[in-house]
Amino acid sequence: MPYIDLNADLGEGFGIWQLGDDDAMLGIVTSANVACGFHAGEPAGLLRVCRAAAERGVRIGAQVGYRDLAGFGRRFIDVDPEDLVAEVVYQIGALQAIAQSCGSTVSYVKPHGALYNTIVTHRDQAAAVAEAVRMVDATLPVLGMTGSVFFQQATDLGLRTVAEAFADRAYRSDGQLVSRREHGAVLADAAAIAQRAVSMVASGKVTAVDGTQVPITMESICVHGDSPGAMQIATAVRDRLTAAGNEIRAFC
């Protein structure tokens, strides 16, 4: 039976400001991309998420980002590569301590937001993120976009790369994501998103906004926990994938 992992961004609240229903999403996904305090998240909240993930057997991933709480890590920052190495090392280390205190561990690393999109093509920042992961633990897989410069740099350093697809994001014809600033970048119809996920897994292709069929490889599918109707979307995606004969399990 083919398998696919489901991942979602969690732990992105800050104090009394909560974003999404982390507990509910942990009942659906198999991998949790947990914020590390730079783009979102605060220690007590991250501890709660990691504890809940550990109790449910959900893998914990360090979701590293730019130091940009005000912009939620969705703004490009022209950070010096050496500084970026240090900041990514810091974030992984912080979440690793929290995860270990809950009887779990950081199992992989996934960049967040603008950093994720930037290192698809930005060689210096891609190399910095890959080097930071290698410095912390060269056995940690990195989750990202197939064909990216980041994956090239990670492979050169001997890191395992795990390709993901986005069930609820629109794609350009070059295989990159449509910017969130553009209309239609984030999809909202749960049934259509679920069918799209099944089609991507079965065909290895995704339909871009211009109608182009873009080849895509994936071991994991991302469902966003902060979108309107996130729970309905994630549930529909999991149910449709399972009904189509796919086993839902973590990639690591």
From Swiss-Prot:
GO molecular function, one term: 5-oxoprolinase (ATP-hydrolyzing) activity
Entry EC no(s): 3.5.2.9
An annotated GO BP: carbohydrate metabolic process
Annotated keywords: ATP-binding, Hydrolase, Nucleotide-binding
Record flagged with keyword Hydrolase: yes
Self-association state and partner proteins as the record states: Forms a complex composed of PxpA, PxpB and PxpC.
Role: Catalyzes the cleavage of 5-oxoproline to form L-glutamate coupled to the hydrolysis of ATP to ADP and inorganic phosphate.
Family indicated by similarity: Belongs to the LamB/PxpA family.
Protein's name according to its UniProt entry: 5-oxoprolinase subunit A
